[in-house]
Amino acid sequence: FSDKTVSLASWICMPKYAEENRDVLVRFTRALLKAMDYAAADHQEETAALVAKQTALDQETVYEQRGDAEWLTGKQVSEGAADGTVEGYYELQKENFIAAGAVEVDPPVSDYVLLDVMKEAGEY
């Protein structure tokens, strides 16, 4: 299954906002990457409790979902942005959307994913 699809979490902003607020995007992305590292560093129960509270779910249900996917660390994401791995994930996602008829055009991933922000945010 993982060779046919990928589940990506993405945050969206308009191009004008990205141009005018790059520092905000880098700081926000850096915070997300650090949170990913924190959760991966043997803080899964604590993280599940925080997520459960924010999403109004019981902690056990949230904690059990940790095996539903391959959860990357922030460093893995930023390194993957640098070496092309993350771009490949988005390329696969785009191909699946096109095959399903959900997307009609085939733009380069770099037109809609700010890989440079991911790379810069990973410099911590």
Q: What do these predicted regions represent?
A:
Residues 1-7, 90:
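Short Pro/Gly-enriched coil loops immediately N-terminal to beta-strands
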Residues 4-6, 69-70, 113-117:
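Short secondary-structure boundary/hinge segments and terminal tails
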Residues 90-124:
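Conserved C-terminal helix/tail region of periplasmic/extracytoplasmic solute-binding proteins
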